[in-house]
Amino acid sequence: MQLKNKNTIGFVGAPWTLLVYMINQQSPKKNVEKNFFEDDYLINRILLIIEKFLKIHIKNQIENGANVIQIFDSWAGLLEEKDYPNYIYTPTLNLVNYVKSLNVPVICFPREIKNYKEFCEIVKPDAVNIDYNVDPSMICKNIKIPVQGGLDPKVLITDKENLKKQVLKYLDIFR
C-alpha cells in the first residue's frame, strides 16, 4: 500500500547479519559459531544466495512505495577487520549498487564496525547510520555523507534535561 505524500523507508538486513541469524538460529549476543569460518567458500556461496533474495525483497519494497532503503548490518561488529572485505563490504556494496541502479537512495547501518570511514569509502551509501558507541566528533571529521543516529537509546528514558543536553551535544558536533 503506497502512502500518498508520505516518504517511507524500506528495510533489509545485510547478508552478513542474516547469515549470522541462520548460523546461530537466534541472536548471537557477541559471538558467532567459530567452526563456520572454516569453509570460506561455503560462506561466500550462502552470502550470494542471500543477496539474490534481498534484491527481490528490495525491489518489492520500492515498487510498493519505499523512497529510500536502509540496510542494517546488526552483527558487523562480530567480525575482525580482515574479514570485512568478503563478508561486509562486497555483499553490502552489491546491494547498494543495486538500490542505486533503481534510482533510490540507500542508508547503511554497519553496527559496531571498527572503521566507518573505510566502510563509507568502499560501500558508498548515500547516508550512514552510526551506533552510540561511536565518537560523533570523529565521524563528523572523517565522513562526508549524511549521518544519522549515534544517540544512546537509554537517554530517551532519562530526565528531560539530560535528553536535551545529549541532543544539543549532537547538534553542536554535526553543525
Predicted ranges, named:
Residues K34, S74-W75, V134, K141:
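Histidine/lysine/aspartate-rich catalytic loop segments that bind and position anionic ligands
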Residues V12, G65-P85:
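Glycine-rich, proline-tolerant flexible connector loops at the mouths of alpha/beta enzymes
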Residues K100-R175:
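Catalytic-face loop-and-helix region of soluble metabolic enzyme cores
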Residues E38-N60, N64, Y87-N94, N162-K169, ...:
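A non-catalytic, amphipathic alpha-helix used as a structural packing/dimerization or gating element
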Residues L19-Q26, E81-P85, Y116-I122, I139-K141:
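Distinct, well-ordered alpha-helical segments
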Residues N5, G65-A66, P125, K144:
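A structural motif
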Residues M1-K6, E81-P105, C140-I145:
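Alpha-helix-loop-beta-strand connector modules within alpha/beta enzyme cores
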Residues M1-N60:
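Active-site-proximal, glycine-rich beta->alpha crossover segments in alpha/beta enzymes
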